[in-house]
A protein has these predicted regions:
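Single conserved hydrophobic/aromatic residue that forms the stacking wall/gate
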Residues: 2-13
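Ligand-binding loop in jelly-roll beta-barrel domains
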Residues: 14, 23-25, 35-38, 84-103, ...
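Glycine- and acidic-residue-biased ligand/ion/polar-headgroup-sensing regions
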Residues: 25-50, 54, 169-197
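Loop-centered beta-sheet repeat module
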Residues: 58-105
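Short acidic-glycine-tyrosine-enriched beta hairpin
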Residues: 67-79, 197-215
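Tight coil/turn sites that cap or link beta-strands
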Residues: 81-83, 91, 170-172, 180, ...
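C-terminal amphipathic alpha-helical segment
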Residues: 105-176
Length: 231
């Protein structure tokens, strides 16, 4: 959640081909839960850029003018490929799903300081080496929505690293069972109960669960929205 200030504008996650610190790149998805009027995200360049142009914009403070400003909508998902310069603007609350990687390069931080007058560490040279300088276009996903009597399932994002779906439940929903890899569940609205064989667990907003790759089905009951991610 970031309602008072923008988050680390200019964060860059490494692309796969240029991984250099024994880490994978970090593709991710932002699912907007709520936002203030006029809020949005920065994502990718408006047009093809060169390293020299970006470096000059960082020096003279005009870097924001090179980036796409995208007004957000509640309930919409935004896919951010690794290597894309990006940041969440203030007043935006998202559920963030990321490819597993600990590497982030901070390119710009609004010249902010902490209470001791210190600025956060930047990683400009590393970011310049791995960022995608091409013009960014927001990926468009084909709408895949299944409507049942007691729930609605909508695919939010699908890539080679993960698949995310929103389950809006008003009663009962049987969730997919996977045997090839684990999955995760995050409750972003409401509350309910999960059932797996003889086990049950109550949940509410903010709770998250890892589901092992046992192939055993899980049933969710309640009035809620769950984000299911399969790796």
């Amino acid at each position: 959640r970031d309602t008072d200030r923008s988050r680390g504008l200019g964060d860059v996650y490494k692309r796969q081909a240029l991984s250099r610190e024994n880490e994978y790149g970090k593709n991710e998805m932002w699912y907007v839960l709520e936002h203030e009027e006029g809020a949005g995200i920065y994502c990718g360049f408006k047009q093809d850029m060169t390293r020299e142009q970006v470096q000059e914009a960082l020096t003279d403070g005009s870097i924001l003018s090179l980036l796409n400003w995208i007004p957000v909508e509640d309930g919409k998902a935004y896919y951010i490929p690794a290597g894309t310069v990006h940041a969440i603007g203030k007043g935006v609350v998202v559920c963030e799903i990321q490819q597993s990687s600990n590497c982030t390069y901070r390119l710009y931080d609004y010249d902010r300081t902490d209470r001791y007058g210190n600025r956060r560490q930047l990683h400009v040279e590393k970011a310049l080496e791995v960022m995608d300088y091409h013009r960014y276009e927001l990926p468009q996903f084909q709408d895949e929505t299944v409507v049942k009597d007691t729930y609605t399932c909508r695919i939010l994002s699908r890539c080679k690293y993960f698949e995310c779906a929103s389950y809006q439940i008003h009663g009962t929903a049987e969730l997919p069972a996977y045997s090839d890899s684990f999955s995760s569940l995050v409750c972003v609205k409401g509350s309910g109960t999960l059932y797996k064989q003889d086990e049950k667990m109550q949940f509410s907003v903010g709770d998250s669960f890892f589901v092992p790759c046992s192939g055993e089905k899980i049933r969710a009951e309640g009035d809620c929205e769950l984000i299911l991610t399969h790796i």
